[in-house]
Amino acid sequence: MSAALFSLDSPVRGTPWPTEPAAFYEPGRVDKPGRGPEPGDLGELGSTTPAMYDDESAIDFSAYIDSMAAVPTLELCHDELFADLFNSNHKAAGAGGLELLQGGPTRPPGVGSVARGPLKREPDWGDGDAPGSLLPAQVAVCAQTVVSLAAAAQPTPPTSPEPPRGSPGPSLAPGTVREKGAGKRGPDRGSPEYRQRRERNNIAVRKSRDKAKRRNQEMQQKLVELSAENEKLHQRVEQLTRDLAGLRQFFKKLPSPPFLPPTGADCR
């Protein structure tokens, strides 16, 4: 009775527990020969459960690639080069995908190639065996060229004029400059020429000092003279002020004479 109910060839009936979900990734149960389809098989669940790859969506880059190849602004980079690189990349990617899908032998690793695993993967720009692997380098070179041209087009502030490279002027090394600077020194201290220069320098210094002293003395003498004259002028002003005050007092003390004509009359 129990053997008939739980046989492997007949479906299980009357079980009080719910049916377990099918194990999609158990290799032991999928590859066993001589077993029929179970009730929880992938074929039966396909109509009720959503597909495994419904959420995944493939992105078609052909429109972007064609638009990039047709852009006329990239004058520095050749458009045919972009088109050839993109087409060769697509062809290589398609051939690799067919080879992996058909289950053929993988390409043996050679010089400049990388051995691919049994799992399928999308073509990467960094793969050394892809013919389109030179595209990022070409794009980087073009971008650097555009940036350098844009920087050269911008006005730069004027700098100090530099001598032209083709000028016949001698280019002196630092050692030569030092030697020349060392050669410009004066004569030795014990030589008569050095003594003569030193005497001339001392005489010039003495003359300048004496001239400054004379100017200082002259200024001091002028200052003394002007101070004395100023003092004399102050004394003169004080004397005149005192005389004026005495005259006023004298005229105030005099009596008015009766024979004087009235004010405003012409006396002759």
UniProtKB/Swiss-Prot annotation:
Stretches the record annotates as Disordered: 1-48, 97-132, 152-219
Cross-linked residues, Glycyl lysine isopeptide (Lys-Gly) (interchain with G-Cter in SUMO): 120
GO CC field: nucleoplasm; nucleus; RNA polymerase II transcription regulator complex
Keywords: Acetylation, Activator, DNA-binding, Isopeptide bond, Nucleus, Transcription, Transcription regulation, Ubl conjugation
GO molecular function terms listed in the Swiss-Prot or TrEMBL record: DNA binding; DNA-binding transcription activator activity, RNA polymerase II-specific; identical protein binding; RNA polymerase II cis-regulatory region sequence-specific DNA binding; transcription cis-regulatory region binding
Region span, Basic motif: 195-222
Domain called bZIP: residue spans: 191-254
SMART domains: BRLZ (SM00338)
Ubl conjugation among keywords: yes
Biased composition (Basic and acidic residues): 177-201
Listed InterPro entries: bZIP, bZIP_sf, C/EBP, C/EBP_chordates
Pfam families linked: bZIP_2
Biological process according to GO: DNA-templated transcription; fat cell differentiation; hematopoietic progenitor cell differentiation; inner ear development; negative regulation of DNA-templated transcription; positive regulation of osteoblast differentiation; positive regulation of transcription by RNA polymerase II; regulation of transcription by RNA polymerase II
Residue positions where N-acetylserine is found in the record: 2
Biased composition, class Pro residues, residue ranges: 155-167
Compartment list: Nucleus
Top-rank lineage group of the source organism: Eukaryota
Region (Leucine-zipper): 226-254
Function: Transcription activator that recognizes two different DNA motifs: the CCAAT homology common to many promoters and the enhanced core homology common to many enhancers. Important transcription factor regulating the expression of genes involved in immune and inflammatory responses. Transcriptional activator that enhances IL6 transcription alone and as heterodimer with CEBPB.
PANTHER family: CCAAT/ENHANCER BINDING PROTEIN, CCAAT_ENHANCER-BINDING PROTEIN DELTA
Quaternary structure and partners: Binds DNA as a homodimer and as a heterodimer. Can form stable heterodimers with CEBPA, CEBPB and CEBPE. Directly interacts with SPI1/PU.1; this interaction does not affect DNA-binding properties of each partner. Interacts with PRDM16.
Record family assignment: Belongs to the bZIP family. C/EBP subfamily.
Protein name: CCAAT/enhancer-binding protein delta
